[in-house]
Amino acid sequence: MMRTHYCGSLTEAQIDQTVTLCGWVHRRRDHGGVIFLDMRDRDGLVQVVIDPDTPEAFATADKARSEYVLKITGRVRRRYEGTENPNMVSGQIEVLGKEIEVLAASETPPFPLNDDTINVSEEHRLKYRFLDIRRPEMLDRLRFRSKVTNLIRNYLDDHGFLDVETPILTRATPEGARDYLVPSRVQNGSFYALPQSPQLFKQLLMVGGIDRYYQIAKCFRDEDLRADRQPEFTQIDIETSFLNDDDIMDLMEGMTVKLFNDLLGVKFEKFRRMPYSEAMRDYASDKPDLRIPLKLVDVADLMQEVEFKVFAGPAKDPKGRIAALRVPGAGSLTRSQIDEYTKFVGIYGAKGLAYIKVNEIEKGIEGLQSPIVKFIEPIVMQLLERVGAENGDIVFFGADKAKIVNDAMGALRVKIGHDLNLATCEWAPLWVVDFPMFEEADDGKWTSVHHPFTLPKSSVEDVKSNPGEALSVAYDMVLNGTEVGGGSLRIYTLEMQKAIFEALGISDEEAEEKFSFLLNALRYGAPPHGGLAFGLDRLVMLMTGATSIRDVIAFPKTKTAECPLTQAPAPVEANQLRDLGIRLREQQKKEA
């Protein structure tokens, strides 16, 4: 063994023991002939002292610089009084170094690794990710991620789940995003697709009698990136037979409760279950952040007869919405602050942001401050009564197509809540249930809200006659406004699966071409089954307080799906393309 202990594991229990450490020089200080080295490894830091009484070790330490890899043997001793460091696990002790060996020298790193804050671009960090990972902050997050996956495996193993791998090279199926395609050399002109999820394979495992399955699976989606999206991501994928939706939610809730209790010391009460319709009505989001107590109120019925077209139009539009957002005590917002919120909702397509400041409600119209009061004077007091407005409040209004209002006012609710420190708790988990089975696309066709294998609450006949009214047996776990997991019961009869395909405009021929293996499996006695998939990256991001999932992934891609470290994606040799039967078409030069 090259070492006896990790640097960060040494405590007072090792005092007077001789130890051997291996690690990096985190920081070097020379104090009046005595050299101090803060040695760092995966588990943390320890202070090593080298004095001139060991001249060979002292000479080696004198040449060592930041990020040198050293092997040090020495005796653990208590630090002198007044020099302890309560912020370190090893802060009560130090190692008196006797022997030092340089295992590897280091050039000066392109950015400091020993600062608590790092002032360098993310792309530069990703280019030197092997160095960035050395930073204690990054090491802590990756260590935490490992603890999460280990706890999840143990929990699922204890509940009878089997870890089963599913294929990475499969065929393209419509799941909402673009597939990453892999050309086949053997089957020239044909392509594999990297899986967007193991959805169909885990259903086939249920048909095969596996009963309870899980997998920590790599998934791939060729879509535009955001702070919480990557082209390749990790899913905690779960499927089980002969359990209903309540059983599955209870099981997954128990796992989440254990995660937060064991790793963060956070105790959750029973998760609230909120219908999708309530979430959209009160919070304008299917993943509401319940830390923010603000709610939206529908007021379109009061606006139908007003002469103000901004309100009257959406009030009479079946696809429109007018929502009011009362912010208690925020009547002191300045015009410039309101202008900033107006710009903010514009990001979501809103054309403006109407408001009423309630100064002295007992004075009626005279006690209000607003550019819109004169247009809605006949109903303004009724409006304020409905939203529960009081003196000192401000009420914002969104009026447009329902989607624009929901996107804009839902985001505004959360932003104002954070800006004004209105959050009532640190964590707010819930289940959102009773999702619509379908939603209408711009072309008037039905599309799946989740995926076409979700079990509806409706009968086959009702799905065929009135798909727009069908609800699904689907459930999303939401935490602090982020969807961390989503699942459903699955269709397990051939008749229902064909009815769903029909509602989606998928012909029998297309269904057989793309899903013949699934349809065939449903002919041979599929059990009732369902499951859920957690986004591991997003879950760890929330639990560690990271601002991006790129900070909890060892080697992530940038927002443009590139890897600065390896320069992927990259061109390939012409002979490789030729073997695959692929020829690149030169882009036409732009005319001058």
Swiss-Prot record:
One of its GO terms (biological process) is aspartyl-tRNA aminoacylation. GO terms for cellular component: cytoplasm. Pfam families: GAD, tRNA-synt_2, tRNA_anti-codon. L-aspartate binds at E175, R221, H450, R490. Residues 199-202 are annotated as: Aspartate. Coiled coil: none annotated. Transmembrane segments: none annotated. Aspartyl-tRNA synthetase with relaxed tRNA specificity since it is able to aspartylate not only its cognate tRNA(Asp) but also tRNA(Asn). Reaction proceeds in two steps: L-aspartate is first activated by ATP to form Asp-AMP and then transferred to the acceptor end of tRNA(Asp/Asn). Homodimer. HAMAP family: Asp_tRNA_synth_type1. Belongs to the class-II aminoacyl-tRNA synthetase family. Type 1 subfamily. This is Aspartate--tRNA(Asp/Asn) ligase. It comes from Acinetobacter baumannii (strain SDF).
